[in-house]
A protein has these predicted regions:
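Glycine-rich phosphate-binding loops of nucleotide-dependent enzymes
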Residues: 2-263
Length: 263
């Protein structure tokens, strides 16, 4: 899905974004500008507001104030499916697939939904061949071609996450949000999955929320550190690792510890 041309050279922009629940402000004036094709890791302690931020970007929550822009187009007030068809897609922390459908059927559903399938029989027939071809392509991209007719419920956890990645990119979105994509995986599965993410998101803008520092520092071009609903640092992995504010607020020795353990 090609982005609609807009006045901005940035793929995604957050401008003084705020979100309150009752009297509690969870997101406190976040500003972020992400160039097309950049990979951004979002880290921070539990309760920092990372998932809320993803929900604001993807349209699940409406901002209290501020703006979310996709290639210069304001997303405020748009529903998640509208945002998806504008070129932004997300995966969730909890695997979000159709367990009783096969791998192929899951991917085909993702393709048809992204096409704006209107549930009319003639349009369904017209779209079906293209959707089948795209689903086959997605199976190859996610290394699931040998699992084509296996029900999703019978896949390993890592395979289910790969399937969800396939569904997420099914419509060709240019901006991808991944929420803890490697959570629950073994070290070897994580290593393979990072490689898969890099392969299937080539040329795309990627934002990833992740607690595994090895994943974040190995995947991201830039890292945004969120603490108490604010971005306290946004820089390259090396610069963030050396930032005293980040170490005091969040990282401490965790990066060094994880790297020493081989993460």
């Amino acid at each position: 899905m090609s982005p609609v041309a807009g006045p901005s050279t940035m793929s995604l922009e957050l401008r003084d974004l705020r979100k309150s629940f009752g009297k509690t402000e969870i997101i406190r004036g976040i500003n972020l500008a992400v160039p097309a094709g950049e990979r951004v890791g979002i880290i921070g302690p539990n309760g920092a507001g990372k998932s809320t931020l993803f929900n604001l970007i993807s349209g699940r929550f409406e901002p209290t104030s501020g703006d979310v822009l996709l290639y210069g187009q304001r997303l405020n007030g748009k529903k998640p499916f509208e945002i998806n068809r504008m070129g932004l897609s997300r995966s969730f922390q909890i695997t979000n697939i159709f367990p009783k459908l096969s791998v192929f059927e899951n991917l085909r559903c993702g393709v048809l939904w992204s096409l704006g399938y209107k549930y009319t029989f003639l349009k369904f027939l017209a779209d079906l061949d293209d959707a089948n071809d795209r689903a086959e392509e997605l199976m190859r991209m996610t290394k699931l071609e040998k699992k084509r007719d296996i029900l999703a419920v019978n896949l390993t956890y890592a395979e289910q996450r790969a399937l969800e990645i396939g569904i997420t990119i099914a419509g060709g979105a240019s901006v991808i949000l991944l929420d803890e994509p490697t959570a629950g995986m073994s070290r070897s599965e994580t290593s393979r999955f990072i490689k898969l993410i890099k392969e299937v998101t080539v040329g795309k803008t990627l934002l990833t929320v992740e607690h595994d520092m090895g994943v974040v520092f190995g995947l991201a071009d830039k890292i945004a550190v969120v603490v108490y609903g604010e971005i306290i640092a946004y820089d390259t992995p090396d610069a963030v690792r050396a930032d005293q504010r980040v170490q005091e607020a969040y990282l401490g020795s965790s990066v060094a510890d994880q790297q020493a353990q081989g993460h």
